[in-house]
């Protein structure tokens, strides 16, 4: 569904005039009012598809900028990749492209349009209408969840912007308020609306996708018992193929092909009852298909991490040193995750062969947002915080067994912090290159102790990204994050 003319104008005025100009030059714009666009089941489907398209545009580069490049997993790659190096080296200014939130707020506005208009659309099956609405609520929650983790307090819009008014110029809303009063309530609404008997997509939000976001959000809210209970719910959803819809993959070779083959070159598919993935590890991912999105919508997984591309980052020496620790020697994930290639430790998790298989070269590698092992280790952390060390370590053992490693026992730890750090190290290795490590450091407030020796990150406020100067020029009610001052460049 094309963005309506006054929607684009209003959002651009509020958020980024420069981006608006580029957007208008690249895309034809419909003159049809939003209320006239949301009339049929086909309109609803197109409108929801647009949300996923905007999520893909938002995360195409920012998946790495926001979740990976500020962490101890990576070091700068090719000298020509200066944008990435500034983020990695903690030298960001207010004109970084990853500091822009324009596309993210376009996504939020599209979810708001869906939430407003989908309930009034007549459909043959009410369950389909509810499912579209549930996806919209879940995607709005996910968008704001990214926003508060990246910038902290952000402007809050829960109604669609359909015409220009002064109301589009908003101050920033407290991040904890957004988490408590928007993100978690939206996810609870999505939980009640998603069609559990038909929606078996992993490229879209299923009920397990809702629960994955919800569990993650509960961990940020330090609601460990609720996170634990939410992850348990995933075991109740059956697959039409038999067994569970999401589950742990116990074989390391199959774990490897999940990244090199399962995430590659899946066709466009709008049939929610068709689960085209063999791996049940995958819960929700951002899909890339050149036929669907064109050459401007390809994945950066290959270009930014391959020595045959413009390698933006390499795996850091600090990350590699983990495999030298006594209880990590012989980790079967190492050779599947990293390879020394062209004078750098290269992230090879998503690539097969010496350079790449043919599918990688088409740049159609999907980005995993959530998978089941992520949830297991998150649940282990939640249980450790509840004093259930044995149960937490049982979950860790399942993951480490697959990697060919032994696991410490409850008696090997003297404190909850030691158990949590053990789990966080496991998350770091298991989820390398999946946009999770930086957010783990933020959530657990370990970013100072981990990153200060690497890039000097230690001042309060440095953990947030700057707000792009253009947003502040356009909206004087927005105040820059304190670490970056109130400069406009």
Segments predicted by a language model, with ranges:
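Acidic, glycine-rich segments characteristic of secretory precursors and extracytoplasmic regions
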Residues: 2-4, 8, 20-67, 113, ...
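Long, intrinsically disordered, low-complexity segments
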Residues: 20, 41-42, 52, 60, ...
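Conserved, well-structured interaction surfaces
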Residues: 40-59, 80-151, 173-178, 187-200, ...
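Short, surface-exposed recognition loops and adjoining beta-strand edges that mediate ligand/DNA contacts
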Residues: 62-78, 157-159, 195-213, 219-298, ...
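Flexible, polar/acidic helix-loop-strand segments at domain edges
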Residues: 79, 85-88, 317-372
């Amino acid at each position: 569904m094309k963005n309506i003319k006054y929607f684009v104008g209003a959002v651009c005025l509020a958020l980024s005039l420069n981006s608006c100009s580029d957007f208008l030059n690249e895309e034809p714009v419909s003159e049809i009012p939003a209320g006239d666009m949301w009339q049929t089941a086909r309109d609803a489907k197109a409108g929801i598809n647009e949300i996923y398209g905007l999520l893909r545009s938002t995360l195409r580069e920012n998946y790495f900028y926001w979740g990976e490049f500020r962490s101890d997993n990576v070091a700068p790659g090719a000298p020509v990749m200066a944008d990435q190096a500034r983020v990695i080296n903690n030298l960001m200014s207010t004109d970084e492209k990853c500091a822009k939130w324009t596309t993210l707020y376009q996504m939020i506005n599209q979810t708001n349009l869906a939430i407003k208009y989908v309930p009034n659309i007549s459909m043959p099956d009410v369950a389909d209408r509810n499912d579209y609405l549930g996806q919209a609520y879940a995607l709005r929650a996910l968008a704001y969840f990214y926003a508060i983790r990246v910038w902290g307090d952000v402007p809050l819009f829960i109604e669609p912007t359909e015409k220009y008014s002064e109301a589009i110029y908003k101050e920033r809303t407290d991040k904890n308020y957004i988490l408590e009063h928007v993100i978690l309530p939206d996810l609870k609404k999505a939980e009640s609306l998603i069609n559990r008997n038909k929606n078996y997509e992993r490229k879209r939000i299923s009920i397990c996708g809702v629960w994955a976001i919800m569990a993650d959000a509960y961990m940020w809210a330090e609601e460990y018992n609720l996170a634990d209970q939410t992850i348990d719910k995933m075991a109740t959803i059956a697959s039409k193929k038999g067994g569970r819809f999401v589950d742990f993959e116990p074989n390391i070779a199959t774990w490897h092909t999940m990244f090199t083959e399962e995430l590659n070159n899946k066709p466009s598919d709008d049939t929610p009852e068709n689960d085209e993935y063999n791996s049940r590890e995958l819960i929700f991912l951002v899909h890339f298909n050149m036929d669907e999105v064109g050459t401007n919508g390809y994945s950066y997984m290959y270009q930014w991490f391959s020595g045959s591309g413009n390698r933006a980052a390499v795996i850091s020496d600090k990350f590699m040193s983990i495999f030298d620790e006594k209880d990590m020697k012989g980790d079967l994930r190492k050779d599947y995750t990293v390879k020394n290639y062209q004078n750098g430790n290269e992230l090879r998790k998503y690539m097969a062969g010496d350079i790449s298989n043919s599918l990688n070269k088409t740049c159609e590698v999907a980005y995993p947002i959530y998978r089941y092992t992520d949830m297991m280790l998150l649940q282990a952390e939640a249980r450790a915080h509840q004093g259930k060390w044995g149960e937490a370590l049982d979950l860790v053992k399942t993951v480490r067994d697959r990697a060919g490693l032994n696991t410490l026992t409850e008696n090997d730890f003297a404190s909850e912090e030691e158990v949590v750090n053990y789990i966080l190290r496991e998350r770091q290795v298991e989820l390398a290159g999946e946009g999770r490590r930086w957010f783990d450091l933020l959530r657990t407030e370990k970013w100072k102790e981990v990153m200060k020796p690497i890039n000097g990150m230690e001042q309060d406020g440095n953990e947030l990204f700057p707000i792009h100067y253009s947003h502040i020029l356009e909206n004087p009610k927005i105040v820059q994050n304190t670490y970056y001052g109130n400069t406009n460049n």
